[in-house]
Structures are given as C-alpha cells and as structure tokens.
Amino acid sequence: MWHLKLCAVLMIFLLLLGQIDGSPIPEVSSAKRRPRRMTPFWRGVSLRPIGASCRDDSECITRLCRKRRCSLSVAQE
C-alpha cells in the first residue's frame, strides 16, 4: 500500500517539475532602453579628425561635416 502512495507522490512531483521547467522566462526588451547621452566633456574629447565619417557638424574637430566626412573647407570640390 505504501508503494502506491510513494508512486503517486513521485508522479505529482514529476508533473509539477515539468510545469516549472516549461514556463517561459520573461525577457527584457532592449528597445525600451534609452541610449546613453554623451556629456559635454566627452563630446569635446571625442571629436573626429579630418576625413573621418560623421553625421553632423558637431562630431568633427573642424565643425564641418560634408558628404558624411569631416572636412577642412566649406566648399569641397
């Protein structure tokens, strides 16, 4: 008789263990994170040299971004 009780307890334990193992783990979405902003100090230190790729004038050491490159002169031919 105690064999049946032990077998029933083990079956319930195995069923519960399967439920725990099969539950999904919630993932943290990376889309919700905001990118870190550079402080004015690091913006000044990390200015790009002439010829480096850029997106706007504030990224270049010469403050001239032309055709996605840091430029030395305003009108580039």
From Swiss-Prot:
One of its GO terms (cellular component) is extracellular region. Residues 1-22 form the signal peptide. Gene3D superfamilies: 4.10.40.50. It holds the Pfam family LEAP-2. Disulfide bonds join 54-65, 60-70. Keywords: Antibiotic, Antimicrobial, Cleavage on pair of basic residues, Disulfide bond, Secreted, Signal. Residues 23-37 form a propeptide. GO terms for biological process: defense response to bacterium. The keyword Signal applies. It is found in: Secreted. Has an antimicrobial activity. Belongs to the LEAP2 family. This is Liver-expressed antimicrobial peptide 2. It comes from Homo sapiens.
